[in-house]
Amino acid sequence: MQKYISEARLLLALAIPVILAQIAQTAMGFVDTVMAGGYSATDMAAVAIGTSIWLPAILFGHGLLLALTPVIAQLNGSGRRERIAHQVRQGFWLAGFVSVLIMLVLWNAGYIIRSMENIDPALADKAVGYLRALLWGAPGYLFFQVARNQCEGLAKTKPGMVMGFIGLLVNIPVNYIFIYGHFGMPELGGVGCGVATAAVYWVMFLAMVSYIKRARSMRDIRNEKGTAKPDPAVMKRLIQLGLPIALALFFEVTLFAVVALLVSPLGIVDVAGHQIALNFSSLMFVLPMSLAAAVTIRVGYRLGQGSTLDAQTAARTGLMVGVCMATLTAIFTVSLREQIALLYNDNPEVVTLAAHLMLLAAVYQISDSIQVIGSGILRGYKDTRSIFYITFTAYWVLGLPSGYILALTDLVVEPMGPAGFWIGFIIGLTSAAIMMMLRMRYLQRLPSAIILQRASR
């Protein structure tokens, strides 16, 4: 029992800074929405539309680079720190290539926005302008993620937290300058949010690089000489590890986007109630997602040390802590669901529906916690391909079709509206959680030599 308590302390020490960093990132989005809304409703809507296209694109790149964390953690655990600098350099090359692709996609996203049914031309122009300003931040964001993943792979999660809050503090005044046109800058409205956010991502990257250059704990990595040229073999391995994670993230984001589109014809009350429950669940999701990042680090580090039993301990501890957290957030959600809904909207019908959906959200949180931590464990084992297959099957083969049938058809019961989609979420996430646990169990039952060989690739 003592080893699990010790491991839980280590996991929480890693996870808490990640949680705070994620809160800072979420707050940046909130600040953009509020400040754009303060300028005009059209500008706020433009930021929302632009963000809905930006997120799937940038999260794809983000997921691809997550492969660095277990790679660096495993090298650190095995004492092969001299190889870390080369992996990081290749991570920067990969981030640069992906940035160019993302920027090209976002530059041409105007075709998607203008093809939306009945969209106001002025709104479309502002949304396109916002995206074309924001896309210049894509390299800064992805370079920052490479540097952050280097730190986190070395079990240094506090720098990412600090840079997140630096970004938030810079974002507010820079937003103000570019939205309203102060200090000689043009008045850009919602487009100014894109300019500010792009600038902030570069500030965060440069601040992180400054930290890495000064950190004593990374002196040996910093001083390691090696080629700065692209290494096709290393980049291919990073892509092999990262692409399944990127696709899994992409399918998860697009699932919720598709459900939002399917709910939209049901009416304002249904859309608002669904959005409230989803937004609050997203806030609660920060906890298990951050714990999953910590579990990836610990499992990768233990495998690097050559201890499959300690890796199992880290995995099991992460799951136990995650279930405890999810149980607490579920109890909190059920107990205060009406009060939470009232924070978003005071329409009685909306509050009633949102409170009802939050009962389902409470169940959803437990399944979600298990599956996201399971995904973190598999990343630690470098078993990322299975994450993609599990996620795709659970969300798009089981979750979405069952949600659609329950919500909008009478094949099983009378159409349930948004509640049907939430039951679909539960079916999908519970299926993912079960499959993740079965895969983890299979991996952990392999001979130690095979586990360590797979982890060292």
Curated annotation (Swiss-Prot):
Function of the protein: Multidrug efflux pump that functions probably as a Na(+)/drug antiporter.
Chain ranges on the Cytoplasmic side, renumbered to this chain: 1-10, 74-92, 148-159, 210-242, 297-313, 371-386, 439-457
Protein's UniProt name: Multidrug resistance protein MdtK
Pfam families, per the entry: MatE
Cellular compartments per GO CC: plasma membrane
Keyword DNA repair tagged: no
Annotated membrane topology: Multi-pass membrane protein
Organism for this UniProt entry: Escherichia coli O157:H7
Origin: domain of life: Bacteria
Gene: mdtK
Stretches of the chain found on the membrane's Extracellular side: 32-52, 114-126, 181-188, 264-275, 335-349, 408-417
Intrachain S-S bonds: none
Coiled coil: none
Segment forming the signal sequence: none
Residue ranges crossing the lipid bilayer per the database entry: 11-31, 53-73, 93-113, 127-147, 160-180, 189-209, 243-263, 276-296, 314-334, 350-370, 387-407, 418-438
Main subcellular localisation: membrane
Entry's Gene Ontology molecular function annotations: antiporter activity; xenobiotic transmembrane transporter activity
